[in-house]
Amino acid sequence: MSKYRSLEVGHISRDGYYDYQTSRPMQCVIQGTRRILWPQTVFYDIAVTDDLHLLAQLGPEPNYRWMDYVRETLHFAKQYDVSRIVTLGSMFAECPHTRDLPIDVSVDGVQSDPDSEYNGPIGIPHIIDAMAIEEGFDTTSIWVSVPQYLGGNEPCPQATLELFQQLASVVGLYLKAQELEGKADQWRAHCDVMVRNNADLDGYVDQLEHDYDMKQHARAIASSGAPAVEQLVQEAEAYLRDLP
């Protein structure tokens, strides 16, 4: 946001949405004065160009009253005549850091890649997307997979970069990301060192690379549309799923 003109235009009251033992307030000192920062959701109007503004919603996932929270979110979207709601998210998956991180995109609730359909627990971005569709909004949902072997809650600049690039594609503009690209390079270099220093992890990543490359190759062949090739791809993917 710091690369563009942005203005805070509203927020969702924190009352009733958060468990403060889970989403704890933070203490900080600003110009010598101690302040407490409570978890809350803030909306920013970001001027990408004179003709394109993004309404960005930033805040921790609420612990309670998700439906009410989403209704307030959509109320802001209607107030600012939002034409498309884009939700972003990440999840841990079995993928190598040495390849492009897998991206899953759905438009108006329809998955672009049926093979990557997700079944399981969901978070507030999914609820926003689903309720926005019910309210008549156009929606795009973008999720990136992060290597699960990294673990922890450390930021993943590569995942952020790939989400950013997908967002740029949705809005149809080049968005500035030079600083983020540098952080992504540093992240990959750090992961390389970590893997090289652990023989078991090194072997695991080798297997993930092999599986990833096999799937990409199978998808490329499948694009030819030949029935025999389609069957071959299905058999290859079934084999990969059965690997330990």
Where are these regions (language model features)?
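Hydrophobic/aromatic beta-strand patches that form the interior of the parallel beta-sheet core
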Residues: 10, 55-57, 86, 138-143
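A generic structural motif
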Residues: 8-15, 84-90, 179
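Short, hydrophobic/amphipathic alpha-helical packing segments
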Residues: 66-74, 125-126, 164, 233, ...
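Internal, conserved structured core segments that host functional sites
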Residues: 52, 60-108, 128
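Solvent-exposed alpha-helices and their adjacent loops that cap or buttress functional pockets
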Residues: 44-51, 77-78, 132-135
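Catalytic cores of processing enzymes, dominated by hydrolases/peptidases
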Residues: 94-174
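N-terminal short beta-loop-beta anion/metal-coordinating cradle
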Residues: 1-61
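A conserved C-terminal secondary-structure "cap"
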Residues: 150-244
